[in-house]
Each structure stands twice: as C-alpha cells, then as structure tokens.
Design a protein with these regions (language model features):
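Long, terminal "pre-/pro-" and other extracytoplasmic accessory regions
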Residues: 2-8, 13-179
C-alpha cells in the first residue's frame, strides 16, 4: 500500500475544511450565527444600502471571521472592479473596504456579478420581499445567480434557530409594501 505524504494529507484536509462564499453553512456555524444576526443592530438590508458607496452589491452575508462577527458585502464598480466591504454590524458604518483581486473570492464575485446581469431589482429588495413573506425572520445572507435566463437571489433567513431559504426572482418587478 503506497504511503501518502503528510503534507498532501494536510493540504487535502485544509481544502475540504475551507468554505467558499455561498456554500452551505454547517450546524455549528448556524448555531454560532443565529444569535449574532438576531442581536445585530444593523440588518442585511441596511448593510447593502451602506455598501452602495463602493459599488453595486452582488452578495452579502453575516459571518464569523477570526472569531468575530462581521457583515461582508461583495460589490462591483465599473463592471469589473470587485470589492469586499465590511460593514460594522453594530454601527452600520463601513469598517473596511478591500479590492478582490484573485483566487476563489474573485471567481465567486464574478459569478455573483453574472447573476445580477438580468436583474431589474436590487438585492436589498429581494431581502425585503423574503422577510415580508417570512415574518419574524432575519436575513443572514443573499447571493445572486443566473438560472434559466433569470437573475435570482437566494436569501437565507433565521428565526431563533429555525433556518429557511427563499429564492426571489430579480427580473420580475413586484411592488413592496413600505415598511
């Protein structure tokens, strides 16, 4: 039986451990995120609005990064410049903006930007619609994708520890009740 070098095993284990943007959240991450989203003073919609200072939002999510909660939003400017905007989940101010220049982050940003190609509505509107259709739930993330020539937004929602996903068509205009 051939021996597999420890470095190869470590690399494989690390690659399986890393979670790309938009990947399914495991149960531990859900348990960690639910109270963060519930306690956040800034909603996903507010973060999306704030991030527009740095381009068009193409995805957003609450996450735990290095043990600390944050609201991360990917934006695109001038059609080809991608940024990660970190919005402080307590104050609503932009904490940091970094260009996305390579790797999986850039590939994901391009895919999400493609998902907005036929959109006639903003992601923020999709989040509002998903929350309206699911009273009492808070939005955890929103990701755009293109499917069957429609721009779709997948909105992940949580209420206590109950998780739901809503898929909203961004190519269909739907007037929303003002909140």
């Amino acid at each position: 039986m051939p021996m597999i070098p420890a470095a190869v095993l470590a690399a494989v284990a690390l690659s399986l451990w890393a979670i790309p943007v938009g990947a399914a959240v495991n149960e531990k991450e859900k348990a960690d995120l639910a109270p963060v989203v519930t306690a956040a003073k800034v909603t996903l919609e507010q973060g999306l609005l704030t991030s527009k200072q740095n381009g068009k939002p193409i995805s957003a999510k609450f996450e735990i990064e290095n043990g600390k909660p944050q609201l991360s939003i990917y934006t695109v400017k001038d059609g080809s410049k991608y940024f990660e905007v970190i919005v402080d989940h307590s104050s609503g101010a932009i904490a940091k903006t970094e260009p996305i220049t390579g790797g999986d982050d850039l590939a994901n940003a391009k895919k999400q930007n493609d998902g907005m190609f036929r959109a006639t509505r903003e992601l923020r509107e999709a989040v509002k619609e998903a929350k309206r259709d699911n009273p009492g739930y808070n939005a955890v993330s929103v990701l755009s994708e293109i499917k069957d020539s429609h721009s779709l937004a997948t909105v992940t929602l949580v209420k206590d520890n109950d998780w739901k996903t809503a898929v909203i068509d961004l190519t269909v205009y739907k007037p929303l009740i003002k909140e």
